[in-house]
Structures are given as C-alpha cells and as structure tokens.
C-alpha cells in the first residue's frame, strides 16, 4: 500500500476516507466557513482545506459521486480531474450543476471521490507515417454504426 501525505490547511478539514472496505475511491469533503450555492447550469470551485503529497509516478483523480449525480445532477465537468504528484496547493473541486435548481454545498459534505492511479511516462516519437489498422481514421461513433 502506498502512502499519500495529507496536510490540513484548515483545522476543520476532513481527511480523505474510504467509505467501505471495497471502495476504489476515497470521499473528499468540502471545507467551508459558510455554504456555497451552485446555481443551476453553473459551476463553483469548492475548497477542501487539504493539500496532498502524491508519490512520483502516481496521480490523484477526482471523480463525481454517483449519488450527487443521480439525485441532484451535480458532477465534475473535468472528470476525472488530475492532481499531479508535484502539486502542493489546496485541493479544490470544480462542481457543475446540470439541474434546474440551485444546490447548496455545506461544510463536511462529501463532494467527490479521489482515486490514486499509477502514471506511466512515455516518449513521444515523431514519425512520417503510422501503421495501418482496420479502423483507420474512423472516429466519433464510427464503431457504433452498423453497416
């Protein structure tokens, strides 16, 4: 098991926590002095009061919570959001409200999930041509069309 160092930037911040033994993601909670309203069809940047030290070769991915998406149409517009190993600032979550009504985020609300993932570095090699495949340049729904 790898270790992620986590620094509380606010005394009331809540450390990331797995809700169940089999959970892939840790719950991330809002750290607020007062509630934030995410207006309908708008976004809000929600602080967590936490900073992370992720080991080299890993990233943290922030993902939506399924219950917020299902019940309130609250999601993350850049999911999965990548937190790089060399970032040391406050972890903040961009929430988007796809619903028709404003959504209130209160201190301690679980607003996202965080998954730690291994990252492989690659070398980009410029070439004059690419190898041929059956699919070729077909994209954007190409494989979903019956012909």
UniProtKB/Swiss-Prot annotation:
InterPro entries attached to this UniProt entry: dUTPase, dUTPase-like, dUTPase-like_sf, dUTPase_trimeric
Database matches in HAMAP family: dUTPase_bact
Species assigned in the record: Chloroherpeton thalassium (strain ATCC 35110 / GB-78)
Enzyme Commission number, as recorded: 3.6.1.23
Pathway(s) of this molecule: Pyrimidine metabolism; dUMP biosynthesis; dUMP from dCTP (dUTP route): step 2/2
UniProt similarity note: Belongs to the dUTPase family.
Molecular function GO labels: dUTP diphosphatase activity; magnesium ion binding
Metal-binding keyword on record: yes
Database matches in CDD domains: trimeric_dUTPase
Keywords for the protein's UniProt record, in alphabetical order: Hydrolase, Magnesium, Metal-binding, Nucleotide metabolism
NCBIfam families: dut, PRK00601.1
Function statement: This enzyme is involved in nucleotide metabolism: it produces dUMP, the immediate precursor of thymidine nucleotides and it decreases the intracellular concentration of dUTP so that uracil cannot be incorporated into DNA.
Entry-linked PANTHER family: DEOXYURIDINE 5'-TRIPHOSPHATE NUCLEOTIDOHYDROLASE
The protein, known as: Deoxyuridine 5'-triphosphate nucleotidohydrolase
Keyword Transmembrane belongs to the record: no
Chemical reaction(s) catalysed: dUTP + H2O = dUMP + diphosphate + H(+)
Cofactor(s) this protein cannot do without: Mg(2+)
Coiled-coil segments on the chain, per record: none
Binding site for substrate: 65-67, 78, 82-84, 92
């Amino acid at each position: 098991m790898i270790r992620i160092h986590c620094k509380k930037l606010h005394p009331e911040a809540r450390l990331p926590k797995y809700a169940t033994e089999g959970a892939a993601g840790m719950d991330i909670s809002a750290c607020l002095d007062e509630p934030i309203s995410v207006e309908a069809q708008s976004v809000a940047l929600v602080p967590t009061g936490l900073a992370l030290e992720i080991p080299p070769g890993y990233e943290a991915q922030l993902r939506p919570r399924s219950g917020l998406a299902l019940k309130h149409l609250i999601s993350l517009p850049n999911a999965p959001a990548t937190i790089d190993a060399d970032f040391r600032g406050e972890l903040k979550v961009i929430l988007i409200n796809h619903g028709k009504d404003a959504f209130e985020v209160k201190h301690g609300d679980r607003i996202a999930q965080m998954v730690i993932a291994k990252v492989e570095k690659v070398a980009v090699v410029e070439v004059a041509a690419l190898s041929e495949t059956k699919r070729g340049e077909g994209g954007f729904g190409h494989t979903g069309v019956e012909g």
